[in-house]
């Protein structure tokens, strides 16, 4: 109830702006970690449906939550309200030396397969086609001190673009 109340307050305060709700990552190792119940697909579904009706599906956040919860990534994603997708965020994951999952890295084969699975559901009409798909790479999450690699972006962007065109056919 508190989550819905807060979102409705924001929607009233910013009534001229569209509100899109993003599924968050589960990062139990962070001091500001989102409580696990807020990441359960059933609650995400309820909150999105009773407020904005628009989901920003962060595929990597969903994959990370599923890994930490010990459930299959596809099962976790399938339980989210795919018919309410408005936007998609895509990034790669990496297992840190501390054994914790991180996002905004280069896409691994496993990440590409999950993206393809999501896009296939959209292509078949099971989920709504997003208005926007964003490749999130680099930035402050690269905790190993290295800057974002331009070659990685140059390699991943065209491949992702082709997948988006395939999804839209």
List the predicted regions and their residue ranges.
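Alpha-helical scaffolding segments of alpha/beta enzyme cores, especially the outer helices
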Residues: 5-12, 39-46, 50, 75, ...
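Secondary-structure boundary elements
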Residues: 8-18, 49-56, 82, 124-127, ...
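Aromatic-anchored, glycine/proline-accented short structural segments
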Residues: 34, 38-90
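Gly/Pro-rich active-site loop or hairpin
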Residues: 65-130, 138, 144-147
